[in-house]
Amino acid sequence: LVIAVVIALGSMLSTAYYHPITKFVSNYSTKLIIAGFVVPLGISVLINRINLTINKMAFFTYSVLTGLLLSYAVFKYGIGITLFSCIFAAGIFAIMALFGYYTKEDLERYRLILKINMFFLICLFSINLYFGIPILYWIIAYSALINFTSLIGFDINHIKKELILMSKNEIFLDRVSLMGTMQFYLDYFVLSLALMSIFGKTFT
């Protein structure tokens, strides 16, 4: 995860200081945003069907994409809003991670509704990128904030159980660890975007 974050930051900085990449991100921002949601979902579906090394390479490639999207967020909202949103999201992530790890409640019963909401929000967000309906913008932003905050707790709890259950299966353990990292990465990324969407419109 640390390597992925370093790659993402490197990608963001290279975009900020290298004009051709800056132009590319500006021209293809909508497609990059959609790809930012589709790629991790695709990896999660294929993770048990393809080689673990390929999965890791795909994850690091996704980290580059995340860096490009963060650079776009800086262009759109400014460094202050972007940084504040990322720090705020990190605080929420830490709290929900602790809750998900230590809670005795069975969170599996929320799995279906959270996953359905996630796919629905991603589809709705992708559509609204083209239509730009203001009321839909706010519905998506606040719904994403609530849903992905909840998903952090659920995913931590779910991965913890999977790791305990498969602790003696090294191959499966590696795949579960990678899947968990990817899911946490996506949860944090979308949570940060939701906060940027809210703070960006509120304070600018």
Language-model features: locations:
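A hydrophobic alpha-helical transmembrane-helix feature that marks the membrane cores
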Residues: 1-204
